A protein has these predicted regions:
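Single conserved hydrophobic/aromatic residue that forms the stacking wall/gate
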Residues: 1-11
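Non-heme Fe(II) oxygenase catalytic core, chiefly the N-lobe of the double-stranded beta-helix
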Residues: 12-133, 138-172
Length: 172
């Protein structure tokens, strides 16, 4: 199950580490029609090890950095259960391969999709302020923190946030 809704509130105001959001409904609507046709009924493999590039940061924060791998297969295009709108359900961190495509075709297709998802006209940047709260629908947005705040990167700023996530439905 994915997380239906996520909310985050600042406790120690970060100087950097803005949050980026990308609209996956609009990403689907504006995606090249040839790519849409190619992926509309396909599934992709998602892996928890996609975040392994953070392992050194985990080691500094947690003291170990051990990460177990979990993988799952999800539709690339899902239907939002409340709006009925089609949304892209892939992301550059966790999506590793399109099922029923060879590696080269999968990599090329995913690269085009990921570049499309990052277009400025599909994204917004949320700048944290004292006691700010951000709440989003995980089913229809791609989100990530700009990682310019980790202590090991020479900035040394504390980032403390409270997070809540509400379990959602299975992607379909």
């Amino acid at each position: 199950r994915d997380k239906h809704v996520t909310g985050v509130q600042t406790c120690a105001l970060p100087i950097w580490g803005d949050k980026m959001f990308s609209n996956m409904e609009l990403a689907w609507e504006t995606l090249d029609k040839n790519i849409k046709e190619k992926i509309k009924d396909k599934k992709a493999i998602h892996s928890s090890l996609g975040a392994a590039f953070f392992v050194n940061d985990y080691k500094r924060m947690e003291g170990n950095g051990n990460i177990d791998e979990y993988s799952s297969t999800h539709p690339i295009v899902r239907t939002h259960p409340e709006t009925g709108k089609k949304i892209l359900f892939v992301n550059w961190t966790y999506t590793k391969k399109i099922v029923e495509m060879n590696k080269k075709e999968s990599d090329e297709t995913l690269k085009k999709i990921f570049e499309h998802q990052a277009r400025l006209d599909l994204t917004c940047r949320f700048r944290w302020t004292e006691n700010a709260i951000a709440i989003w629908d995980n089913r229809s947005v791609l989100h990530y923190a700009i990682t310019d705040f980790f202590p090991g990167r020479g900035l040394g700023h504390e980032r403390i946030m409270d997070r809540i996530a509400i379990e959602g439905d299975r992607p379909n």
